[in-house]
A protein has these predicted regions:
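Bacterial N-terminal signal peptides that target proteins for export
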Residues: 1-10
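C-terminal segment of classical bacterial N-terminal signal peptides
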Residues: 15-24
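Short coil/turn and helix-start
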Residues: 31-32, 46, 61-69, 83, ...
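Structural signature of tandem alpha-helical TPR/SEL1-like repeats
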Residues: 31-39, 68-76, 107
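Terminal, low-structured helical/coil segments at or just beyond the last alpha-helical repeat
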Residues: 34, 91-124
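Short helix-capping/linker turns of helical repeat alpha-solenoids
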Residues: 41, 46-50, 60-64, 78, ...
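TPR alpha-solenoid repeat register
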Residues: 52, 67, 89-91
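Hydrophobic face of amphipathic alpha-helices that form TPR/SEL1-like repeat modules
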Residues: 55-63, 92-97
């Protein structure tokens, strides 16, 4: 029951965060007339654009816009994003941590570390 409440609360908070940064994120991930292609946003995220990184995290968390829901990848992108933009990305990390096991968080942190160590080239 508690997990269900946290999950519902997480979705509400995430929705608020996404609306708050929606224009900035869409502008960052839009290469051609607000394209929602995952490859466009991924390319920007790998170039270090924190808005695109947050967008990748949100896409993986919600399983929308061309990706399957994957909280580990969502956490990885939020962690990478938090290196440059702690506010919103840090809140995203807090939301994800409420829904993830310690093992999943450890895996996601390791993936983020490898991604950052490769200058954002090996982010899978």
């Amino acid at each position: 029951m508690t997990k269900l409440i946290y999950g519902s609360l997480s979705i509400c908070v995430l929705s608020y965060l996404l609306v708050a940064v929606d224009n900035q994120v869409q502008a960052s991930c839009a290469v051609d007339k607000r394209s929602k292609k995952i490859t466009d946003c991924l390319s920007l995220a790998q170039l270090g654009n924190s808005s695109a990184q947050l967008d990748m995290s949100a896409r993986y968390f919600t399983g929308t816009d061309g990706v399957k829901r994957n909280e580990v990848l969502a956490y990885m992108w939020a962690k990478i994003c938090a290196k440059n933009e702690r506010g919103t990305c840090g809140k995203m990390i807090n939301i994800l941590e409420m829904n993830m096991s310690k093992k999943e968080i450890a895996v996601a942190k390791e993936m983020a570390s490898k991604c950052l160590g490769s200058n954002l080239k090996k982010c899978k």
